[in-house]
Amino acid sequence: MRIVFAGTPEPAVPSLERLIRSPRHDVVAVITRPDAVAGRGRKVVRSPIGALADSHGIEVLTPERPTEPEFLARLTDLAPDCAPVVAYGALLPQKVLDIPAHGWVNLHFSLLPAWRGAAPVQAAIGAGDDMTGASAFRLEAGMDTGPVYGVVTERIRDTDTAGDLLGRLADSGAALLESVLDGIEDGAITAVPQPAEGVSHAAKVTVEAARIRWDRPAAVVDRHVRSVTPGPGAWTTIGDVRLKVGPVTPTDERLEPGEISVTKSGFLIGTSTAAVRLDRVQPQGKKQMAALDWARGARLDAEVRAQ
């Protein structure tokens, strides 16, 4: 099939790589978000999908808005049979959805209808789910509401960060997406409507939402930290210092919520149940470092609390 692929960040790369290698499909163009300015040097940076397409000589479309007449005209001229989508980063209007002959197939990193929305992997870890997966579904106007072609499942490990889990789902989801496109071409696959039960929503994780609440149980704090790692990153304030917090480990020691203990065994902070031991921290504007080294160097007042 003639394929136009839409995607932007690194988790979309395995899917595009598989489709480029596929002997059955021809990726004639990709759609990705416009180049961004990033870093201290304020350099213009191509999205991972745009960079991959460039390396293979594939046409790259970067509309500011998918309603632009020039974009609509070019997409129509490309005459795609199908358009797979993986984390593109913008909603597509109906006039765009209507262009491919077989529609758009979205790869979403949850077992729909669970965790519809922008941050399904983060939500699944934060909620303490044992299992998640990826769903390939036909894109429609609603938010992740279209009928599902197929799914793959993935167990959530006790130490998984969002980055760990998303990496595995990106790989297994890529294989699913290729299989679904093969089935669509063969006329051998049918999309099944999502059930009305089991719907949940995963809003985008803001920096404020990533702040650690020390009045919650240790297990919840641990899941929260892992769910927002690597980005936007869990954080807290201690005195007048804002710290990004890396992995934490629940312990058997008891401290009051936010209470701090610095001993040979580690840098501990209390929760509503047991204390957790901090592994790595990153003071704002500085490099990541061992949490115990930071705490010893900070010479914390006995009354200071994590907020």
Curated annotation (Swiss-Prot):
Pfam families: Formyl_trans_C, Formyl_trans_N. Its EC number is 2.1.2.9. (6S)-5,6,7,8-tetrahydrofolate binds at residues 110-113. One of its GO terms (cellular component) is cytosol. CDD domains: FMT_core_Met-tRNA-FMT_N, Met_tRNA_FMT_C. It catalyses: L-methionyl-tRNA(fMet) + (6R)-10-formyltetrahydrofolate = N-formyl-L-methionyl-tRNA(fMet) + (6S)-5,6,7,8-tetrahydrofolate + H(+). Keywords: Protein biosynthesis, Transferase. One of its GO terms (molecular function) is methionyl-tRNA formyltransferase activity. Attaches a formyl group to the free amino group of methionyl-tRNA(fMet). The formyl group appears to play a dual role in the initiator identity of N-formylmethionyl-tRNA by promoting its recognition by IF2 and preventing the misappropriation of this tRNA by the elongation apparatus. Belongs to the Fmt family. This is Methionyl-tRNA formyltransferase. The gene is fmt.
